């Protein structure tokens, strides 16, 4: 084996950055000279201001390209009525959030900062602390949510009360600029990050595509589609693969080359991206409740690998696509321009359009009467909820289980009212509630049977598909799971939630148990008391008859199913085993 001469390959060779930025300030930045070279001097205040503004902007606004993709759904004749309904709610939500009061999503995320510091940039040290201060200022001063829990020991936790710590990863590079990518990453989409350890045997055209489609199916709808999906094949290590997944889902690597070389440069496979996007459209899951728009786009990146390893990574950026670039150069501090007027994407005819027909449900009456009313309607039925709802999520359910395990029984409020899986952002002055959208239902699946056996949690409201144990529990105990659109948290806070108060465990912050009063709160029957599961009906390869039955009910509901060749593709491509 002959030795090759040394050659350094930039592992991620990107083309020129064409991102549009605005100038935040030219203060706190100066130019000096050292040993004949110009040095960019950056004061700590510059880093704090940059992080503060970037996370503020990303919490209330999204990229124009993302908003355009959402708007395109409204004009697509192949989009289902559900796709269009969800897209319209996203645009309305963005229009409210862009005012800077109610954030786009109630889960205002973990603050993640990736920084690349040029060798001729001097800060004097303490960069992480200065950036963390900016994150702190954003979450303290804006109406955001504190989602970070600190471990006191292996089992006891406490909310940090600031949303710190942030994840800050800084790298040294050439040049005289300091460049950043800031990500506000919610738990729902973060939890849809996966690593699979495979082998060379996977790397054939027939096997790889089918493999990636199978993995894509497992994402489900819990992380608020339409998604920006990223696949990464290869990597010098597992962690290198997953870091690339995260950045690819944020469009950070869009300017990579489209072919590889013998030195191991990363590249995008554009053709495979197109093929996978078509497969995503044919899954039938759509924008949360059935349709075409499971994904806006897909990125596939190929990396070099060790001969004994073939890591495959998958991740998503959700409908709250909160990614924003920033940079510091000799001219000042620059922040990526996000869309400040998302209302312009809403067609005039839809600006004041009503919400269509829905079954009105009065929640301020005995639970038995509410259950009796819901039992009259099939899965997919659209509802308008009015009255009292209990709000609780992960820790609240753990607390309730502890009570049951001690033989204490359940509090009456969990028996008398539906429970909404959610945790509110801070309430702005003059508002009844902060942004308050649903969290992922599946994390509470293990509690359902025990709760319902004691008369609690008979009606659950959240987002995403659920496991068979929930369907079985609802059939056994006469319960229901209702779906709420994941994403439009500002719309719900402004239009549907009229009062919010803490019922129990105030020390848990957003994880406390709350009570809300709602008007015209939209929901859909997803699992009923007869063992029917809406997602099972649209996903099963054996459910042609069920699809026809549900389609016949579409007059007053939100779901429209497909006919002809598109329906055949949907049925062929969605075996039930892929979803359970």
Swiss-Prot record:
Q: Catalyses which reaction? A: (S)-malate = fumarate + H2O; oxaloacetate = enol-oxaloacetate
Residue ranges spanning the membrane: these are none
| InterPro entries named in the record | Class-I_Fumarase/Tartrate_DH, Fe-S_hydro-lyase_TtdA-typ_cat, Fe-S_hydro-lyase_TtdB-typ_cat, Fe-S_hydroAse_TtdB_cat_sf, Fe_dep_fumarate_hydratase, Fumarate_lyase_CS
Q: Which UniProt keywords apply?
A: 4Fe-4S, Iron, Iron-sulfur, Isomerase, Lyase, Metal-binding, Tricarboxylic acid cycle
Explain the induction of this protein: Is expressed under aerobic conditions. Is repressed by glucose and anaerobiosis.
Q: List the EC numbers from the record.
A: 4.2.1.2, 5.3.2.2
The protein's name in its UniProt record: Fumarate hydratase class I, aerobic
Q: Which gene encodes it?
A: fumA
């Amino acid at each position: 084996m002959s030795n090759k001469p040394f050659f350094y390959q930039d592992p991620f060779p990107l083309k020129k950055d064409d991102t549009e930025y605005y100038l935040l300030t030219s203060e706190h930045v100066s130019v000096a000279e050292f040993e004949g070279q110009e040095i960019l001097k950056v004061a700590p205040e510059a880093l704090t201001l940059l992080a503060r503004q970037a996370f503020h902007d990303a919490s209330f606004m999204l990229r124009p390209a993302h908003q355009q993709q959402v708007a395109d759904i409204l004009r697509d004749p192949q989009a289902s009525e559900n796709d269009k309904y969800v897209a319209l709610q996203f645009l309305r939500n963005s229009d409210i959030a862009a005012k800077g009061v109610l954030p786009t999503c109630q889960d205002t995320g973990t603050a993640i900062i990736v920084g690349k510091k040029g060798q001729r940039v001097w800060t004097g040290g303490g960069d992480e602390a200065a950036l963390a201060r900016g994150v702190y200022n954003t979450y303290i001063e804006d109406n955001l949510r504190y989602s970070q829990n600190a471990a006191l020991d292996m089992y006891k936790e406490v909310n940090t009360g600031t949303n710190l710590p942030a994840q800050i990863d800084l790298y040294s590079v050439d040049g005289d600029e300091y460049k950043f990518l800031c990500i506000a990453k919610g738990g729902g989409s973060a939890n849809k990050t996966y690593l699979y350890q495979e082998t060379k045997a996977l790397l054939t055209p027939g096997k790889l595509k089918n493999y990636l489609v199978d993995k894509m199916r497992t994402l489900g709808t819990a992380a608020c589609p339409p998604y920006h999906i990223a696949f990464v094949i290869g990597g010098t290590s597992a962690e290198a693969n997953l870091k690339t997944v995260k950045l690819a889902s944020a469009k950070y690597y869009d300017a990579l080359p489209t072919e590889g070389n013998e030195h191991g440069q990363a590249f995008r496979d554009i053709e495979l991206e197109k093929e996978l996007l078509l497969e995503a459209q044919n899954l039938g899951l759509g924008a949360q409740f059935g349709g075409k728009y499971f994904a806006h786009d897909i990125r596939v990146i190929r990396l070099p690998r060790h001969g004994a390893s073939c890591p495959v990574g998958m991740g998503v950026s959700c409908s709250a696509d909160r990614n924003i670039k920033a940079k510091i150069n000799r001219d000042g501090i620059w922040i990526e321009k996000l869309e400040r007027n998302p209302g312009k994407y809403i067609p005039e005819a839809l600006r004041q359009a009503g919400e269509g027909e829905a079954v009105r449900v009065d929640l301020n009456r005995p639970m038995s009467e509410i259950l009796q009313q819901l039992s009259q309607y099939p899965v997919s039925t659209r509802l308008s909820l009015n009255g009292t709802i209990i709000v609780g999520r992960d820790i609240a359910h753990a607390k309730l289980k502890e009570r049951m395990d001690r033989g204490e029984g359940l509090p009456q409020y969990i028996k008398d009212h539906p429970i909404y899986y959610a945790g509110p952002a801070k309430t702005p002055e003059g508002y009844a509630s902060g942004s308050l959208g649903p969290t992922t239902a599946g994390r509470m699946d293990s509690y359902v049977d025990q709760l319902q056996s004691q008369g609690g949690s008979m009606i659950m409201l959240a987002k995403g598909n659920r496991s068979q144990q929930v369907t079985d529990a609802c059939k056994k105990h006469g319960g229901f799971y209702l779906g709420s659109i994941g994403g439009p948290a500002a719309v719900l806070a402004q239009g549907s939630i009229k009062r919010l108060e803490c019922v129990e465990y105030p020390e848990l912050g957003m994880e406390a148990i709350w009570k809300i009063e709602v008007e015209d709160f939209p929901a859909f029957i997803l699992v009923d008391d007869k063992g029917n599961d809406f997602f099972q009906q649209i996903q099963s390869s054996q459910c042609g008859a069920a699809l026809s039955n549900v389609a016949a009910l579409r007059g007053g509901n939100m779901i429209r199913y497909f006919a002809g060749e598109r329906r055949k593709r949907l049925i062929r491509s969605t075996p039930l085993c892929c979803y359970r």
